[in-house]
Each structure stands twice: as structure tokens, then as C-alpha cells.
Amino acid sequence: MKIFAIGMNYAAHNQELHGTLKRPDEPVIFTKADSAILNQGKPFFIPDHLGRIDYETEVVVRICRLGKNIPERFAHRYYDAVTVGIDFTARDLQKKASEAGQPWTICKGFDGSAAIGEWIPKEKFLDIQRIHFHLDINGKTVQEGCTSDMLYKVDEIIAYISQFFTLKTGDILYTGTPSGVGPVHIDDHLEGWLEERKVLEFNCK
């Protein structure tokens, strides 16, 4: 299983972290190790040696068939389910890596950094590009977004990635985070929502 993720895919998030609303010339793709997966309901143990850890709430899609060099017009055939995930990010390390022109492998891919919710068949949604989602921490909404605000749409991302990587059944794609990211703390209770469906819930320890 491969875990793909896209950075800088919501303009407001780009503004809050990078000071620009500009769409990147190409999708900003990174990957996580399979040991990054944190399944629904499992606690997230905050690493004590990585500095500040931020939540980044994202819509995630699941690849359902083998594909390479997929035309964008056919990309919708290659994923079958949607959920909410958290792309946990070691923010201090990310800043240092970015300033040094280094990759995000550690700051984005450490163990447990890819929380994943309950999968919902994509047919349950009228339009993948019009899904509202949000994250509650300790009962308070801290981040919310809509997939209509993506700079690169899901089908565009899949077509782009498949130029470089063969997509396989079970691969997953984190599609980017809106504005409102922030730190997590021990004893925080996180709940992720797709529309009115709670699909993700766990505690930080």
C-alpha cells in the first residue's frame, strides 16, 4: 500500500503558512510510509522528540484498481471510497526542512502521522468536489473546508500521480488541507466529519 498526499492544495492554507494564494505550477506530492497509518479509533501518541505537532484535516480517497498514465477524464473510475484523515505534521521540522530545501519525509511521514477514518462509498455523495468536512477537538470545531476549494481536483491529482507511480488497489490519497491548522496536545479528543457523518474519532496521548 502506498500513501500519497498533496500539499498546498487550498489557497487559504497556502496564505496562512506560505504567504501566497497562488496555485502551484504542479501538484505538490509527497508520500508517507505504511507505518504512518493510524486506524480509526486508535490513539495518537504525540512524539516527544519532534517539537510541535499540528493536525491537518483532509479528505482522503481510496484507490480501487490498477492504473498507470490515467487520463483525467477516466480518473473517477479509479477510486471507490472517501473518508476524513489527519495529516499530522511536525511543524518545526517542516519549517527547517523547507528552509534548507530538504524533503518532508520525517516531518510528514513518522509513525502514526496518517490518521484515517471509516470509508464511505463515493456513491453516497452527489459530487466529490462539493463535500464539506470539518474537525472538532474537545467538542469545538477548529478546522473546516469544502472540496470545491481545492486548487487541484481529485481527478487531476490522480491523473498527475499516475504519470510517475503505478496506482494499486488499496493505495490512498490525502487531498490537501484547508486553513485552520493548529497543534494537538495530550488528552485532546478529535472527531472528523464528512458532511453530517462522523467518520473519525480518537484521542491524543
Give the label of every model feature segment.
Residues 9, 13-23, 29, 83, ...:
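Catalytic-pocket segment enriched in acidic/His residues
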Residues 1-85, 91-95:
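Extended, compositionally biased flexible segments
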